């Protein structure tokens, strides 16, 4: 059985698909391995896909030492659209089609994010305040005062741009929100 194969301590990388939470992945590994000693190194949004490092058994003890490096994210954004969740899956709250921006202007705007920045975590995030996740407050229609935090953006590059949408790659510190 698979549970016998998982009676080990270690770290595995799982390519988390869209529409699955990081905890869903942990639950699947727990069932497959027959152990509760499973964790993950950082949360990926449910609609994000990518590598999610999973610790099994005693490997969980090294999480604090491994989860400090720079993380790299690749994504896309649409200009002129604002949603209540700050991502494409939220309800549109504002649109603007009357804008003109070229690649040079976009590169300059992105450049301002490089280095150490102050960032207010979004309401639709797993950050806990008062023992409750911010997205739980948001789903109840409540807002919570969230203090800004320092984040470090090592690299922020535009990969492609068509005048309205662009692809980007960002290398950033743990705890940075990319929306």
What are these regions (language model features)?
Residues 2-179:
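Catalytic/RNA-binding core of pseudouridine synthases
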């Amino acid at each position: 059985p698979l549970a016998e194969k998982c009676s080990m301590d270690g770290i595995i990388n799982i390519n988390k698909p869209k529409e699955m939470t990081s905890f869903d992945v942990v639950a699947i590994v727990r069932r497959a391995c027959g152990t509760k000693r499973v964790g993950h190194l950082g949360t990926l949004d449910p609609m994000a896909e990518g590598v999610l490092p999973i610790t099994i058994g005693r490997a969980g003890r090294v999480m604090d030492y491994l989860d400090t490096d720079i993380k790299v994210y690749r994504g896309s954004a649409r200009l002129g659209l604002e949603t209540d969740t700050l991502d494409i899956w939220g309800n549109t709250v504002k649109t603007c089609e009357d804008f003109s921006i070229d690649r040079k202007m976009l590169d300059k705007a992105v450049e301002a994010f490089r280095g150490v920045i102050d960032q207010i975590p979004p309401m639709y995030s797993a950050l806990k305040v008062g023992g409750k996740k911010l997205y739980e407050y948001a789903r109840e229609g409540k807002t919570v005062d969230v203090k800004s935090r320092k984040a470090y953006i090592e690299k922020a590059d535009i990969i492609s741009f068509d005048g309205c949408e662009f692809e980007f790659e960002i290398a950033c510190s743990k705890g940075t929100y990319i929306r």
